[in-house]
């Protein structure tokens, strides 16, 4: 999968997508620029917070987060959901437990694989009250959520309703039946996170390591950055 570059103009309060054309060349490109690349201004609002999926609930940050991070399911222009990172999302008879299998081969932009634990740790981090994430309540239906709202937490406690079976499989136990849970996991708060996130969440939010179709390419103060396309 090729990743296009997403560039953020920090001082100009704008977000630009660096879209690389497939094939051909740009005859007007300046010396040293990447051929076949263009800068298109897409979202003229600045993120209010660092770009962490579970702590983003506004348009300025939500748009780039949607481009940077792929979730278990995605939605087409008509709002129809289909599996993206997920291979399958299978409920038990009363939809109180789901077995989720993810596709192998997905990687973050730092080269590390997207695994089942990439989801379970990320979801638990967002749910944990110690971490004060804006989207915490989205995980209230998962067993163990109430335990992560108590005082005295360290921040690394995990949701008891999430169990890793193997690198590509995990289960989700819910507090009650929820037949639309497979749709909810398409929201950006349910994105996976790499291990590097937990070392310094604040620094991560300024330069996210993501798994979506775009990667972050910060613009310089004058000339900007060159569009990059990763294999």
Language-model regions: role of each:
Residues 1-7:
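Bacterial Sec-dependent N-terminal signal peptides
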Residues 19-21:
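C-terminal motif of bacterial Sec signal peptides marking the signal peptidase cleavage site
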Residues 35-49, 87, 97-100, 119-122, ...:
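Short, well-ordered beta-strand elements
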Residues 43-93, 209:
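N-terminal lobe/hinge region of extracytoplasmic solute-binding protein
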Residues 118, 134-194, 220:
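Surface-exposed binding/hinge segments that line
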Residues 174-231:
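Gly/Pro-rich hinge or "lid" segments in bacterial periplasmic/extracellular proteins
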């Amino acid at each position: 999968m090729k990743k296009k570059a997403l560039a953020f103009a920090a001082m100009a309060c704008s977000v630009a997508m660096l879209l690389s054309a497939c094939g051909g060349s740009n005859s007007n490109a300046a010396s040293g620029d990447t051929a076949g690349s263009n800068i298109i201004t897409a979202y003229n609002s600045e993120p209010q917070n660092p770009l962490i999926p579970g702590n983003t609930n506004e348009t300025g940050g939500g748009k780039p987060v949607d481009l940077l991070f792929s979730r278990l399911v995605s939605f087409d222009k008509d709002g129809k959901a289909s599996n993206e990172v997920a291979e399958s999302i299978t409920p038990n008879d009363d939809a109180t437990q789901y077995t989720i299998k993810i596709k192998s081969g997905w990687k973050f932009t730092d080269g590390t694989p997207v695994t089942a634990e990439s989801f379970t740790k990320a979801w638990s981090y967002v749910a944990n009250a110690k971490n004060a994430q804006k989207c915490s309540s989205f995980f209230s239906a998962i067993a163990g959520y109430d335990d992560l709202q108590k005082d005295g937490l360290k921040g690394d406690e995990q949701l008891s309703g999430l169990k890793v079976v193997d690198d590509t499989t995990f289960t989700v136990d819910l507090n009650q039946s929820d037949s639309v849970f497979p749709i909810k996991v398409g929201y950006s708060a349910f994105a996976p996170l790499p291990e590097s996130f937990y070392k310094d969440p604040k620094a991560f939010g300024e330069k996210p390591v993501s798994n979506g179709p775009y990667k972050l390419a910060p613009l310089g103060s004058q000339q900007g950055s060159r569009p990059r396309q990763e294999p």
